[in-house]
Amino acid sequence: TPGNALKGDNPEHVEIIKRIARQNITRQPDVFIQISVPNEFQKVGKYNIGITAGIETTNVSHEFLQGCNNMDLILVTSEHSKKGFVDTVYDKVDEKTKQKTGDLKLTTPMEVLFEGVDTNVYYKTNDLHDTIKDELSSIKNPFCYLFVGHWLKGNIGQDRKDVGMMIKTFCETFKNKAARNRTALILKTSHATFSIIDRDHITKKVQEIIAPYGNKAPEIYFLHGDLSDEEMNSLYNHPKIKAMVSFTKGEGYGRPLLEFSVTGKPVIASNWSGHIDFLKHAVLLPGQLTDNRLPINF
C-alpha cells in the first residue's frame, strides 16, 4: 500500500485524515478501526475492527490468529486472504504435560471488503500524460509487456512476486527472435524506496539475469520512481503496452492487475491468490480449426 495513498487536496481523504488518532485517546471510542498487520491489533474501543491484507500464502502465524481474536470484526482484501485465516488451526499444548488442551483458530468474524478500483482515476483513454509519452518514445519495440509491482526479498525464484524468474522466462521465450520483431518487457518496479541506491540495485539484478543471453537477450526496460495516478493510467494505456504479465506467487489483492484490466488489454497472471477474485480464467485465441491429419490412421 503506498504511503502517499491519502491526498491532502482530496476532500474525502481529508475527512479520513481528520479521524486518524494521533494522540492518547481521552475517552473510549464507540468504534475503533485499526489498519495493520494482525499481531499489532489492539482492543481500544467498545467495538473494534481490524483491517488487514493478511498474508499471501495458505497459513498464518499463531500471532496473527491471536491478534485477530482480540478484535470484534476483521476485514480482509480477498477470499484468498480470508481462507488462510479460516483454514489455519494450531494445537494448544500444556507446557508441563505436553498434552493438547485445545485449538488455536480464528474465532472473530471475518469478511472480505473488496477494494475495487476508482474508475475516475483508472480508465481507458488515448489522452496520455506527456511524461509517459516522452519516457516511452525511445522504446522502438512495437509490442511490450508490462510488469508493475515491488521486487521483494529473495534470490531468483524465491521473491514473492517472482520477478527474477519472470525476467528469465521472458529471455528464454524471446531470445531467438529477430531484433526487428523482438518483444520487450517493461518493469515498473522497486524494492522499498525510490532512491538511487534502490534503482542501481535493481539494475544490477536485471543485468545479472540477462547476462548469460548476451546479444540474444530481448529488450528489457526499467522504470523507477514515484508516478502519479494519472501517469500510471497513461502507462497502462500507452499503445506500446500490449499486455500485463505477472508471475506472482501470492497477492493479498493485486491492485495493479485490476487497474490495468480497465484498459481492456490482456492480463497474464498466475491462477492463484487474491487477484482471482476479479481476474477470471478466460483464454480466447482467434483462429480456425482445420483437419490436419494425414490420410493414414494414427
Per-segment meaning from a language model:
Residues P2-V86:
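Extended catalytic core of nucleotide-activated donor transferases of GT-like folds
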Residues K18-I25, V89-P109, R199-E219:
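Short mixed-charge
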Residues L73-T131:
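Donor nucleotide-sugar binding/catalytic pocket of nucleotide-sugar-dependent glycosyltransferases
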Residues T119-S234:
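Conserved catalytic-core segment of nucleotide-activated headgroup transferases in glycan assembly
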Residues S234-G252, V262-K265:
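Acidic donor-binding loop of glycosyltransferase active sites
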Residues G254-L257, W272:
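Short glycine/serine-rich donor-binding loops of glycosyltransferases
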Residues P266-A269, V283-L284:
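Short hydrophobic beta-strand element within catalytic cores of glycosyltransferases
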